[in-house]
Amino acid sequence: MKKAWMAMALPVLLAAPDVRAQDAASAATRAAQAELAKRLPLDDPQDFKNAVRGKLAEIAGGLITGKDGQIIWDRRAYAFLDAEEAPDTVNPSLWRQARLNAVHGLFEVVPGKIWQVRGYDISVMTIIRGKSGWIIVDPLLSEETAAAGWKLFADTVETQSGKRPIKAVIFSHSHSDHFGGVGGIVSKEEVAREKIRIIAPHGFSEEATAENVLAGGAMGRRALYMFGAILAPGPTGQVDTGLGPKLSSGTIGYMEPTETVPATGASLTIDGLAFEFLDAGGTEAPAEFVFYIPPYKALHTTEVVTHNLHNILTLRGAQVRDALHWSKVIDAMLLKWGGSAEVAMASHHWPTWGAGEVSRLLSNQRGAYRYVHDRTLFLANQGATLHELADQTAEAPVQGADFSTRSYYGTLNHGMKATYQRYFGWWDGNPANFNPPPPEQSAPKYVALAGGADKLLAAGEAAIASGDYRWAAELLNKLVFAEPANFAARSALASTYDQLGYQAESGAWRNYYLAAAASLRGAEIPASASNGQSRSFVSAIPTSVFFDALATRFDAASGSGLKGVFQFVLPDSKEAVAVVVEGGVEFPRYGVTDAAPTATITIDRRTLDDVMTGLAQFPALMQSGAIRIEGDRTAFLSWFALHPRADPRFNIVVP
């Protein structure tokens, strides 16, 4: 989950002069909350017992700061979650999940053998005792939170049992909240000097650095909404993501693995301790594994099995995941280790203890993902489209009894739509929907059809009054797209999103609705999660990926007549890229040296890293001689000017 796209996201200020406070929970919302509370065993104490089990220490106030005193993590603003009873403005099931995720500290999972640092990032860091030292699993998103978590462990455990070296670091999968903090616990120099093993799944290096580079701008913009980064914490604001509290806002780093586990899995001895690895690539992440430690009877389920139904397609955008394969990987875990594993722990949330409970967790999670897949195809093969699937489907039977399968992050609703997309694509098969006009063109016609803006607004307000918020959103969205300066319409649509957000069980859905409402009101706060990428992360981005990303920024409309070959030479990394421009397309040929380029540009890869991190700009580098241009300098400058920066603040809820 949870990646470096946040580094590209900027605060968003969509000005509106009519800033209103959020609405209170409506009667319809209060009734929906009460109905859900009645049918779920919200008073089941087992998860709360597991969440606090083995707690040894905590960071005071949950406050972590950076070198310059900037706040990286702060749980003080979330003290409202101390209340047991959910307010009317928060789904009671999500409130329960948020309170569980709010538990923070150092926890002993297997006495004297395994510990976890939880509640100081969206993810969890696990520390395992080897024969002579420590094995670290998933060192969080930010270097600052990882360092604080490691210090908490050292101050608590090592002061009692003695200081031991870090012998290995395990990256369970290719999302940055599971490796980005590695520089906070070990340096590259220490890895080389101490021969520290860094173990990751096959394909990790390519996926960890390349993912989201091409589409990072749009993903980052949507992520601000999904994670509630432009919302203040509180009962009417950001409460939780479902997967964890929120994203930390520190420095994201990277280290290259020293070894990878193949697709066939492997049995490894790490610091004298036996590990069994099972490949899980193509489930929650493209490169992923789970592992079992036989001497400790401990199963690490990574992000394949957590205490929620995960995303088949995340709201920020990604490639669709395979729910069928996901269910089969969980079944393989159940067959291989069910009945033997006495504790299951993951990269998020709290552990599950007891062989029977671990097997039950795996079985229920397997069933939940299989249900998403099979129910989608059952209905699709009877003619249902992605617009109809969710309304024709009741939740899986297990979801009413096992909180670990509930829609706290992913949902049955958009998981089925994603599965439909995986098999059938974006189109529902109806030719009326094959090439509809864009909203900016169709919306004014809907307004006219309704008899004018006042009548459409009245219809939307009537839908709000009746508690039909989905219909209200559809009506009022048309009006806002037709008349974005109509602040009565914006206010009514924001009120609609308030209620939809309050009712949402998914933390991601809640955040998205409430962020949309804040945008309509012009009430966003500066983004609370704005990670900086360290040089180690940027340097790991393959040069070929950088030039592919650059090509996506080429303005084909303005450059349709441009033709040429721009040869890049990177002396320090001994790389060459020939960029062929023709017919409105820019095609980088990595590793190719053109015989007769239009211009040759010599630039060190290290200098290119400075450009990517914002430490240097091309014009200044050309003036200083750090970039040397031979050949048609004017043609190069004309080509270079055809790469405008993407707007990280593009509109979502208005045209």
Predicted regions and their residues:
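Divalent-metal (often Zn2+) His-rich catalytic cores of metallo-beta-lactamase-fold enzymes
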Residues: 23-37, 298, 308, 324-388, ...
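Active-site metal-binding motif and surrounding structural segment of the metallo-beta-lactamase
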Residues: 132-133, 143-199, 262
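Feature captures hydrophobic
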Residues: 468-474, 481, 485, 495-655
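Metallo-beta-lactamase
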Residues: 108-109, 133-144, 199, 204-382, ...
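Alpha-helical segment of the N-proximal tetratricopeptide repeat
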Residues: 442-475
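Conserved beta-strand hairpin/beta-sheet module of binuclear metal-dependent hydrolase folds
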Residues: 99-164, 289-293, 297-303
